[in-house]
Amino acid sequence: MATYFVGDLQGCYDELQRLLEKVRFDPTQDLLYLVGDLVARGDKSLECLRLVKSLGKSAQTVLGNHDLHLLATAFGIKKVKSRDRVDAIFHAEDFEELIHWLRHQPLLVYNAKQNWVMTHAGISPDWDINTAQACAKEVENVLQQGDYCHLLSQMYDSRPDLWSADLTGIERLRYIINVFTRMRFCYRDHRLDFDCKSPVDKAPEELTPWFNLSNPLYKQVDIIFGHWASLVDTPTPHHIYALDTGCVWNNRMTMLRWEDKQYFCQPALKDYAFNG
C-alpha cells in the first residue's frame, strides 16, 4: 500500500494518467490525494472529475479556487471564465451528479496519525491545527447543507484580509475560503495579499510567502498544498510540500509518494500556451 499526493490537475487528464501508470497505482491498495483545482484551463476537466469520483474511497481531493468557481457557474451565479475549458461538464449526462459530488468535498484533510494536513493554498499564519479544522468545517457545512448559493455568490472579495476570531457571518466564511483556496503572499502583519503571483525572488520586499511567517504549526505538521505554480523549483522549508508545478502552464505535473518522499514528474503532453 502506498500514499500518493498530486498537484493541481486543471483538466490535465492525460498527464495524470501517465503518472498513475508510472507508479502502478492500484486503487484496491493505494490512496491518491489531490490538492484541488481538478478543473479549469486544461481540455479534459470532465475526465478529471469523473476519474477522481470513480476512485471512491481510494482518492480524496480538497476544493480549490477553480473548483469553487465551477460550483458558482453551475448554479448560475457566475459565468465561465474565458480561459476555462469546462463546457463539456455542463453538457455531460452526469453533470448534476458530478456537481453534487464536488460540492461535498472538503477544504482540508488532516491525518493525525501520519502528521500531515492537505489544503489547496495553505493554512493561515494565525491558525493552529484545531482552528484550521474548525474553520474548514464551518465552510463545508454551508456548502453541503446550508445556503451554498448565497455563500458562492458572496465569496468573490479580498476582504477581510486579516484573521480575527471575532469575525462573523459571510466575512468570516470569505476569509476562510480565501486562506484555503487563494492565499500566496502575506504582509508581515499576516494580512493576505492577492495581487502578487510572481516567483518569490521577484516579489515586493514587504511580502513574504505565507509559509515563511512565524506559526508553530508550520514546524509541527507536514503541510501539502498546490495552487502556486510559480513556486516551481523554489526551495520551501522542512514540512512544507508545494506540489503545483504548472502542468497547464506547459511545465509538468508532480506526484509525491509519501512513504519514501519520492517525487514523480510528467511533463505537459501538449501545448497549453493558449492559456497564457
From Swiss-Prot:
Pfam families recorded: Metallophos (PF00149)
Catalysed transformations (reactions): P(1),P(4)-bis(5'-adenosyl) tetraphosphate + H2O = 2 ADP + 2 H(+)
EC number: 3.6.1.41
GO molecular function, a single term: bis(5'-nucleosyl)-tetraphosphatase (symmetrical) activity
Entry keywords, A to Z: Hydrolase
Disulfide bonds: none
Entries under CDD domains matching the protein: MPP_ApaH
UniProt-listed InterPro entries: ApaH, Calcineurin-like_PHP_ApaH, Metallo-depent_PP-like
UniProt family annotation: Belongs to the Ap4A hydrolase family.
Function: Hydrolyzes diadenosine 5',5'''-P1,P4-tetraphosphate to yield ADP.
Protein name listed in UniProt: Bis(5'-nucleosyl)-tetraphosphatase, symmetrical
Provenance organism: Mannheimia succiniciproducens (strain KCTC 0769BP / MBEL55E)
Gene that encodes it: apaH
